[in-house]
Regions:
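Alpha-helical transmembrane segments of multipass membrane proteins
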Residues: 17-22, 26, 69-72, 90, ...
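Juxtamembrane and boundary regions of transmembrane helices in multi-pass small-molecule transporters
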Residues: 5-54, 64, 206, 210-233
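Structural signal for the C-terminal ends of transmembrane alpha-helices
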Residues: 28-31, 75, 94-101, 127, ...
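Membrane-interfacial helix-loop connectors
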Residues: 1-12, 110, 125-233
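Membrane-interface junctions of multi-pass transporters
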Residues: 47-49, 76-79, 96-151
């Protein structure tokens, strides 16, 4: 498996490049809206962020727990802990030390998004059992001739375009068994002997992350942001 730090090490260059390109594109696309206007400056100066903080102690406790969870994410490979356990553990500790009622916290969970992913993973599991994904993996290998570079390029391009229109998490969940099937194929596995890791996973991650920036529905974080924006107007 690939731990958090290994993934971050290999994906950081992509993040930096993507962020730089995105900033340039935003400045070009929204150049009219980004111009300074006197009324907007006055509105910003009139804002008082302290008034929005209802409980400063809760904010400090939450920040400490969030920081601890992020650090644990970085160390989970060394500690041999699953990231899901770390995340749930952080949530449990926060509930205990803040005294927030569990039902009150659960009320703010984005249940529609979670149920959507639950249903999606069930469908992906069913398609995998049917053998359709394995057949698709063999078709990809036939198309690329088993060449490592061509296979990585194909996975990256397909992932980038598909993730722009299909949320990158469900798309990645669908592609995982396909990449696994390609990796263990006898005609292709010999290409991976020179690597300490499977480069196909990074090709998939690169394409899915890149495509997730393409549209609002390209990433689950975008969907959550939209839901929160709709809730608070």
């Amino acid at each position: 498996g690939i731990d958090f730090m290994t993934f971050a090490y290999h994906m950081t260059p992509e993040i930096i490049i993507t962020m730089a390109v995105t900033i340039v594109l935003f400045k070009f696309m929204f150049r009219k809206d980004l111009k300074q206007k006197a009324e907007n400056i006055e509105k910003l100066q009139a804002l008082d962020e302290k008034k929005e903080i209802k409980d400063s102690m809760l904010l400090k406790k939450s920040a400490i727990i969030l920081g601890a969870v992020i650090i644990m994410f970085m160390l989970h490979g060394m500690l041999d802990l699953d990231v899901s356990i770390i995340a749930l553990g952080g949530a449990a500790v926060l509930l205990v030390i803040t005294g927030i009622q569990p039902f009150k916290a659960l009320h703010h969970v984005e249940w529609p998004t979670l149920l959507f992913f639950c249903g999606l993973f069930i469908i992906v599991g069913g398609v995998e059992v049917s053998g359709a994904l394995e057949l698709l993996a063999h078709n990809i290998l036939e198309l690329t001739g088993g060449d490592l570079g061509a296979t990585m390029f194909s996975i990256t391009i397909v992932s980038a375009f598909a993730s722009a229109f299909v949320d990158n998490i469900p798309f990645t969940a669908t592609m995982i068994p396909i990449v696994e099937s390609i990796s263990v194929d006898p005609t292709f596995a010999q290409n991976l002997t020179a690597f300490d890791y499977n480069p196909l996973w990074y090709a998939l991650a690169f394409g899915a992350d890149l495509g997730g920036n393409g549209t609002l529905i390209g990433a689950s974080a975008n969907l959550v942001a939209i839901a929160v924006a709709e809730r608070f107007g």
